[in-house]
């Protein structure tokens, strides 16, 4: 086991704070509409230019192990805020730095760290309650667009596109962000359920120009196993021919005689039919087939459930208004499933999302939920160069998460105003002792840091700006760093999602509280490398001359 280096009290905290400052100073320059860019070296390709706090934080690794621990703990603040709210990472970092600095001074002055932390926690809870009271719910698409615009650093096109996407696919729908091939940024919406399997044979195509199979009001047979012969389902096929409706078969595979018979019938025009393979693999395939069955009001034909192909009747099949099958995708539009069943299934998937610990599983479950609940929208981000596209994609991702958070928990005035105003709620708090009172005061000072930093990034004096804002009694009154004017933030469309502000403060206070109460640090001592003994070793080779062979 390697030797360890151990540091205590003031020495340990000093190193920690140096690491916190190094990381926070690099991250905080990106805050606000006039925030600056950070250029990050890449091991290959061109450097990455970003204004995304968490991207900067994730790149920082320091040589000194003790300083690095401090930096990594603040990086954890940014990552956690990003995971929970999707935005507000820079605000969280600025808050954490402010709390740690003030807290370290208090500990150095001989105050009890545990009482300080209790005071900090009390103040944070009071501010969170105040934010909830002051929250305004989002109701119109234009408000949704405003939130998106602010998180995308003032790019109105992005805000508008996100608002449009959310209107089309609903709050549960999946909105993905991809890099576009050209300069334009586009929005592409797929309504209904889409899965990544296309037609089994090109003979099923109904529109040769577009290379798609288009089925109107089809019956949908959902079969869990392979179909290699059609003998068991002949009675069912006859019923479908009599109904005059098309048939879509979704099965593990359709092969051999079954495929040949279906193709021949399709070409003769006796039966309008198409077949696709079932999406997913293993247990996920079963779950997705069940989703399709619920969406279309049909049943999964599975021997596990005791249903055989011979016994299948028309009322066991699913229905949909339209099915569009391309080479690699199938889209089911307006399935005939009961609304109550679909809602029940959605709630079941939501419960699974809450329980799962795997990010991959969570992502797949969210995709399934979106396909059932609304649809899928894709925002394709364009730009003149690869570097620009990557930078814009970062901003679109942030804006998307912020907009979702705003719809979920509502909005408060932006530009650091909500936190600064909420600090006034702390004045009524009672502390058990002087050290706790000082902990409460630490938060009162720290919550002004984001507003000051936004002003400083815009070339103004942060202390003067925050003083002027707090002197005004209007709750929404703040400083617009973009125009350099004082105004009503909500009317000007400068708003923050409550969830983002709340999460940033709670995460920052949580990690900063741990840093303040740190008394010892243990790190691996760097091994001293022995000097390279090449010359001496080679000199020793001379002895070989005296050997007897």
From Swiss-Prot:
UniProt KW keywords: ATP-binding, Chaperone, Cytoplasm, Isomerase, Nucleotide-binding
Alphabetized PROSITE patterns for the sequence: CHAPERONINS_CPN60
GO molecular function per UniProt: ATP binding; ATP-dependent protein folding chaperone; isomerase activity; unfolded protein binding
Binding site for ATP: 30-33, 51, 87-91, 415, 496
Listed EC numbers: 5.6.1.7
Gene Ontology cellular-component terms listed: cytoplasm
Top EC class, one word: isomerase
CDD domains: GroEL
Keyword Transport recorded: no
GO process terms (BP): protein refolding
Main location: cytoplasm
Compartment list: Cytoplasm
Gene3D superfamilies per UniProt: GroEL, GroEL-like equatorial domain, TCP-1-like chaperonin intermediate domain
Family affiliation: Belongs to the chaperonin (HSP60) family.
NCBIfam families for the chain: GroEL, PRK00013.1, PRK12849.1, PRK12850.1, PRK12851.1
Job description of the protein: Together with its co-chaperonin GroES, plays an essential role in assisting protein folding. The GroEL-GroES system forms a nano-cage that allows encapsulation of the non-native substrate proteins and provides a physical environment optimized to promote and accelerate protein folding.
Protein name as it appears in the record: Chaperonin GroEL
Species this protein is from: Acidiphilium cryptum (strain JF-5)
């Amino acid at each position: 086991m390697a030797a360890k280096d151990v540091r205590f009290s003031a020495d340990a905290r000093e190193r920690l704070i140096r690491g916190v400052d190094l990381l926070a100073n690099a991250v905080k320059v990106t805050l606000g509409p006039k925030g600056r860019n950070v250029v990050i070296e890449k091991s290959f390709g061109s450097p990455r230019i970003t204004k995304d706090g968490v991207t900067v934080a994730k790149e920082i690794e320091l040589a000194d192990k003790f300083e690095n621990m401090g930096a990594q703990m603040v990086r954890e603040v940014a990552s956690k805020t990003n995971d929970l709210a999707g935005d507000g990472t820079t605000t969280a970092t600025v808050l954490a730095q402010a709390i740690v600095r003030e807290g370290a001074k208090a500990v150095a002055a001989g105050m009890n760290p545990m009482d300080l932390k209790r005071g900090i926690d009390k103040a944070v809870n009071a501010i969170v309650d105040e934010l909830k009271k002051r929250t305004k719910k989002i109701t119109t698409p234009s408000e949704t667009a405003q939130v998106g615009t602010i998180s995308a650093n003032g790019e109105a096109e992005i805000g508008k596109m996100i608002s449009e996407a959310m209107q089309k696919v609903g709050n549960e729908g999946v909105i993905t962000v991809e890099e576009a091939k050209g300069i334009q940024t586009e929005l592409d919406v797929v309504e209904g359920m889409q899965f990544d399997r296309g037609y089994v044979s090109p003979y099923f195509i109904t529109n040769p120009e577009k290379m798609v199979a288009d089925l109107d009001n089809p019956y949908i047979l959902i079969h869990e196993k392979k179909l290699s012969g059609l003998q068991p389902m002949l009675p069912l096929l006859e019923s479908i021919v009599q109904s005059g409706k098309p048939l879509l078969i979704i099965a593990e595979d359709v092969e051999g005689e079954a495929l040949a018979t279906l193709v021949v019938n399709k070409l003769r025009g006796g039966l309008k039919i198409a077949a696709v393979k079932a999406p997913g693999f293993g247990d996920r395939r079963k779950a997705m087939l069940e989703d399709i069955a619920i969406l279309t009001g049909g049943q999964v034909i599975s021997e596990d459930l005791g249903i055989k192909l011979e016994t299948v009747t028309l009322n066991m099949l699913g229905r949909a208004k339209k099915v569009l099958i391309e080479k690699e995708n199938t889209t089911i539009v307006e399935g005939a499933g009961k609304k109550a069943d679909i809602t029940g299934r959605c709630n079941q998937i939501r419960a699974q999302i809450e329980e799962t610990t795997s990010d991959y599983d969570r992502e797949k479950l969210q995709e399934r939920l979106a396909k059932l609940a609304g649809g899928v929208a894709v925002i394709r981000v364009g730009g003149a160069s690869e570097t620009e596209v990557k930078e814009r994609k970062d901003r679109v991702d942030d804006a998307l998460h912020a907009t979702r958070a705003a719809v979920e928990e509502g909005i408060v005035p932006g530009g650091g105003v909500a936190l600064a105003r909420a600090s006034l709620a702390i004045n009524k708090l009672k502390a058990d002792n002087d050290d706790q009172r000082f902990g409460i005061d630490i938060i009162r000072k720290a919550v002004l840091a984001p507003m000051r930093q936004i002003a400083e990034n815009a070339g103004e004096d942060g202390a003067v700006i925050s003083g002027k804002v707090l002197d005004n009694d209007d709750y929404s009154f703040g400083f617009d760093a973009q125009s350099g004017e004082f105004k009503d933030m909500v009317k000007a469309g400068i708003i923050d999602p409550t969830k983002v502000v709340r999460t940033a403060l709670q995460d920052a206070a949580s990690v900063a509280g741990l840093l303040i109460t740190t008394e010892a640090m243990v790190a691996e001592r760097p091994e001293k490398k022995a000097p390279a003994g090449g010359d001496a070793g080679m000199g020793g080779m001379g002895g070989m001359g005296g050997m007897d062979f």
